[in-house]
Amino acid sequence: IHPHAGGYIEFADEIDKIMEDIPAEVAGLCLDTGHLRYSQMDPVEWLRKYADRLDYIHFKDINEKVYNEVLSEHIRFFEGCGKGSMCPIGTGMLDYPAIYKLLTEEINYNGYITIEQERDPRNVATSLRDVKKSVDYLKSLGFE
């Protein structure tokens, strides 16, 4: 189960309800740091809360200035991505050193993590450049 900003399972109460209703042996959870923060949740708190249900993690970061503009203008999620609400990891508002510490020292997560760069799909060069920046930043924290 992958909660997603702009989707049917997005907010804290919806995530809690579906985790309550669906047994762990039936479905795990793919938490997305960017979608959690976009929907007003602290990724560290939620990764900790559902550590025992984590099957997979998606990493992304949010440009705070663009994010605030998108929210104030009531722009839909994917249109906001096209405007640059998502940015290279390490350049936005998420606390990746805290996420790294949680995953490696506290919950000992050893599963897969996908770096996502949600951008205007017509601008492939920018997306690839941003993914490289994200990889370089995450490696500097200690991610392999």
Kindly label every feature range from the protein language model.
Residues 1-5, 33, 117:
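Short glycine-centered, acidic/aromatic-flanked micro-motifs in structured strand/loop junctions
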Residues 1-15:
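Hydrophobic, aromatic-enriched interface-forming segments
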Residues 7, 36-37:
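Catalytic P-loop NTPase motifs of RecA-like helicase/translocase cores
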Residues 12-27, 31, 37-144:
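Histidine-acidic metal/acid-base catalytic patches
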